[in-house]
Amino acid sequence: MARPAVLITGAARRIGAVLARRFGAAGWHVVLHAGHSVSAAEDISATLPSAEVVACNLIDGAVALDMVEDLAARLDDWRVLINCAAVFKPDSADALNPAVFAEAMRVNAETPTRMAQAFLADARAKGGKRVIHFLDMKIANPNPDFFSYTMAKHALASTVKMLAMAQSDPATRVYGLAPGAMLPSHDQVSEEHEISGRMNLLQRLTDPEELADAALFMAQGWLASGETLFVDSGQHLLAQPRDVLYLARQ
C-alpha cells in the first residue's frame, strides 16, 4: 500500500529530526527539507523505511515555492506540510535589529505561509490535507527578548485561523503547534538547559517526542481546523519577564 507523504521543513536537526523519525516509524513517506544541513538530512533519510531529501534556503521564497510545486506534481498522496524550520537570533524590544527582523519575518512567517498556500492549492491527497505551523509558547507568554523572532511567530500564528477559514473542504485543516523550552537554544550549555527547561508549570523537562506525538495526532486524528496546541508543560501559563535562557543565568 502506498504511504502518505509528509514534508517537514528543517528536518535535519533538533525537533525536525525527531519529527522525521516519528513519522517514518508510523508508516509515512517522509520528505526531509534541509537548508545548510543536507548531509545530516541524508543520514536520517537512510534510516527511514521511505524517505527523500529536498534542499533550499527558505530565505528565498520563490525557490521554496518551486520546491512545493515540484512535490505537488509528483507525490500522489501528499497529506501533510509541517513548517518546522525557523531562525532564532537575538535582538530586543528596545533595539530591533533590522537584518535579524527581515530574516525572521521571511523565514519564520512569509515563506511558510506561502508554502502552505501553495500546498493547499496544488497538492494531491487522499482524505484531506493538513498544514501544521510550528509556533512558540511565546505567542501566549511573550517577553522582550528575541524580539524579531517573537514578532514573526505571532505573525505566523495569526495565519492559522485565517487559512483554516479559507478552506472549503472540511477534511483539509490548518493547525498551530506551540512548543516551549525543550532543547538547548542559542548559546546555552546543557547545565543551563537543565534549569531553563524546567521553568514551566509542571517543573519538568518536556520530551521532544511529546511534540512529535502531537504532530502525528494532528496529521491523522480529529482536531478542529484552526486550533493551536501547546506542548510546553504549561510554560505559557506562567508570567516570565525574560526568555528562560536568560532567567536560568540569574
Predicted regions and their residues:
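Conserved NAD(P)H cofactor-binding loop of Rossmann-fold oxidoreductase domains
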Residues: 84-90, 234
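Conserved glycine-rich Rossmann-like NAD(P)H-binding loop of the short-chain dehydrogenase/reductase
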Residues: 26-42
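Substrate-binding pocket helix/loop in short-chain dehydrogenase/reductase
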Residues: 78, 92-102, 196
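Catalytic loop of short-chain dehydrogenase/reductase
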Residues: 129-169, 181
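C-terminal substrate-recognition "lid" of short-chain dehydrogenase/reductases
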Residues: 209-231, 236-237
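Conserved glycine-rich cofactor-binding loop
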Residues: 12-13
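Conserved Rossmann-fold SDR core element
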Residues: 157, 167-182, 224-231
